């Protein structure tokens, strides 16, 4: 069974834990309890393949930012979460993405942009803004509500699909490099 290491990142209070707990335990946690770091595991079937999701729910608080490099090194894919009623959390996505790329030393890291709290009426981040940002990054965008469960499975499953595509691409690139080495002739 394939295991996928997923990391949920985003600013404080955007609903990272609520999304993760909704996926794992099928219920909404409405009291806010800031996370330092929690790990969850769940077996799921995605596109006919049984797989194990190893999900790291991270701290949004700036005082825990030193821990980020460590979990970013081990993560295979990242849910970059903002709250649709918090423009600052949306603006912070750029910093998380840059840190992930720096730590992974790659421009091509599997990510999904997630706009959480879409059931709330007080939207400050327009859907088109988020779609445009995701398009500029070349990553999928999904709106979610941890409260109603809307888009929750879709967000995590889409990230797994992005990781699969990335692994496929990397193995094809590796094969191309190997093939080109065998075609070299020295005269």
Curated annotation (Swiss-Prot):
Stretch list, region Disordered: 168-187
InterPro entries: P-loop_NTPase, Small_GTP-bd, Small_GTPase, Small_GTPase_Ras-type
Subcellular location(s) of the protein: Cell membrane; Cytoplasm
Enzyme class: hydrolase
Propeptide, chain numbering: 185-187
EC code(s) of this entry: 3.6.5.2
SMART domains xrefs: RAB, RAS, RHO
Coiled coil: none
Residues binding GTP: 10-18, 29-35, 59-60, 116-119
Swiss-Prot/TrEMBL keywords: Cell membrane, Cytoplasm, GTP-binding, Hydrolase, Lipoprotein, Membrane, Methylation, Nucleotide-binding, Prenylation
PROSITE patterns listed in its UniProt record: RAS (PS51421)
S-farnesyl cysteine: lipidated positions: 184
Sequence motif Effector region, residues: 32-40
Residues recorded as bearing Cysteine methyl ester in the entry: 184
Activity regulation note: Alternates between an inactive form bound to GDP and an active form bound to GTP. Activated by a guanine nucleotide-exchange factor (GEF) and inactivated by a GTPase-activating protein (GAP).
GO biological process: Ras protein signal transduction
Keyword GTP-binding: yes
Molecular function, one GO term: GTPase activity
Membrane topology: Lipid-anchor
Pfam families registered for this protein in UniProt: Ras (PF00071)
Catalytically driven reaction(s): GTP + H2O = GDP + phosphate + H(+)
Top-rank taxon: Eukaryota
Family: Belongs to the small GTPase superfamily. Ras family.
Functional summary from the UniProt entry: Ras proteins bind GDP/GTP and possess intrinsic GTPase activity. Plays an important role in the regulation of cell proliferation.
Stated name of the protein: GTPase KRas
Organism this protein belongs to: Xenopus laevis
Gene: kras
């Amino acid at each position: 069974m394939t295991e996928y290491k997923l990391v949920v990142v985003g600013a404080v209070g955007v609903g990272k834990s609520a999304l993760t707990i909704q996926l794992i335990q099928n219920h909404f946690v409405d009291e806010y309890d800031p996370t330092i770091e929690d790990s969850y595991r769940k077996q799921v079937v995605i596109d006919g393949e049984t797989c194990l999701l190893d999900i790291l729910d991270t701290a949004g608080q700036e005082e825990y930012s030193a821990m980020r490099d460590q979990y970013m090194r081990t993560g295979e894919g990242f849910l970059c979460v903002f709250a649709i009623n918090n423009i600052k959390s949306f603006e912070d996505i750029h910093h998380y993405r840059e840190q992930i790329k720096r730590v992974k030393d790659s421009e091509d890291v599997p990510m999904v942009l997630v706009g959480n709290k879409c059931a709330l009426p007080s939207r400050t981040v327009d859907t088109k803004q988020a779609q445009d940002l995701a398009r500029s990054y070349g990553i999928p965008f999904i709106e979610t509500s941890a409260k109603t469960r809307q888009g929750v499975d879709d967000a995590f499953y889409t990230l797994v699909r992005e990781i699969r595509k990335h692994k496929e691409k990397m193995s094809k690139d590796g094969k191309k490099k190997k093939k080109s080495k065998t075609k070299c002739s020295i005269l």
